[in-house]
Amino acid sequence: ATKFIQMLTPRDLSKLSVGQCKYVLIVNNDGGILNDPVLLRLKENHYWLSLADSDILLWAQGVAINSGLNVKIIEPDVSPLQLQGPNSGKIMEALFGESINDLKYYWLRELDLDGIPLIVSRTGWSSELGYELYLRDGSMGDKLWEKIMAAGKPHGLKPGHTSSIRRIEGGMLSYHADADINTNPYELNLGRLVNLDTDINFIGKDALQKINQDGIKRKQVGVILDCDPLTGPNTTFWEILKDNEVVGKITSAVYSPRLKQNIALAMVSINNSE
């Protein structure tokens, strides 16, 4: 399983310990990004990929068939739930006790909450303190929800959804918006997740070596939009023009109440990236 997982990602996993998580990229043979999941190592030969907004099951199964490795690939019956925000630590302490405060960033722990089996990781799709709870028994979903909401009530916990504001402020990607199969890691300033100077073998290594050597033609940047406050996130790409020529596109944009301005992620030609 370890050898197979390493085939999927250009990030060196040789020092990934049991109980540890890593943010990784999965790329195709051309170096294009297929997904940017969080990898969780539950046991010596047991891994989870907590995926972004694209499927990777058929890709992984196809790679496995042609790898000759003895691996089993399934979609686990788990229901991920995120608890994010400045008070998430206090709520987790109310649920699990003070020991939860020892859980390090990007590590996981197998826990039982009054008979509810969970994998808890200190990860999340926000730039705040946060946790992800993976429910391992779907029949206990209602019970888990009620317990979390009860513990969170004194701290103002409310149901929510993915926060475009917080993730754009933190420069976090949204697959299909900020990245897709035609985007490579270097265009997203994610070269740190590509370890070319190692002996590891992974899909797309030759292509990424060439891209790294030749350089990129476009690059993701953060921008401020000087206009009236946006009423919501963009739902289409917005062209960026310079001298009436298209030099890029806005991929994610939103108004930030904290920063009191419109902020965005954009993909622009390398000559216009400064």
Which ranges hold each PLM region?
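Internal amphipathic helical hairpin motif
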Residues: 2-33, 88-116
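Conserved, structured C-terminal
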Residues: 40-274
